[in-house]
Design a protein with these regions (language model features):
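N-terminal intrinsically disordered, cationic/polar leader segments
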Residues: 1-86, 91-140
């Protein structure tokens, strides 16, 4: 992982074999980011995506292995009880078969590169579990 700090936030590059979620958590911890938004593109070969069932109030994981383009990775970074909390969604596509998958990013290993922008915001937003929804919602 290599990154550079700018006035608005950070620009990060991941290389083959690096995992997105663990790398972003490491950056957020090192730089003490409290609140941010994430956008990225790249390529991965091992991706686990969660799809939330609103009826069951739980995620169902699906793993995809092979060559996938990351056409969109978006989300946010906040703190929950002082710890980094990432909420990331990803859209991946197989350039050969045309299949596309999207959902909550659980993990993804880079196959070529990832180009990520982390915009940092002043202030703090927390998360609190909602029994009604079954998710950790923004707490202002």
């Amino acid at each position: 992982m290599e990154y550079r700090k700018f006035s608005q936030g950070y620009v990060l590059r991941l290389d083959p074999g690096e995992e997105i979620v663990a790398s972003l958590i490491r950056l957020v911890e090192q730089e003490q980011v409290q609140l941010g938004s994430v956008t990225a593109i790249g390529a991965a070969n091992d991706v686990t995506i969660g799809i939330f069932s609103t009826q069951e109030k739980q995620y169902h994981a699906q793993r995809y292995q092979g060559d996938y383009e990351i056409s969109a990775l978006v989300g946010n970074v906040i703190r929950k009880e002082g710890e980094p909390y990432l909420h990331l969604h990803i859209t991946i596509g197989n350039p050969v078969t045309g299949e596309v998958h999207a959902g909550h990013l659980t993990s993804a290993t880079i196959s070529a590169t990832l180009e990520l922008f982390l915009q940092v915001w002043d202030g703090q937003v927390g998360r609190e579990f909602s029994d009604q929804v079954g998710l950790n919602l923004f707490r202002f």
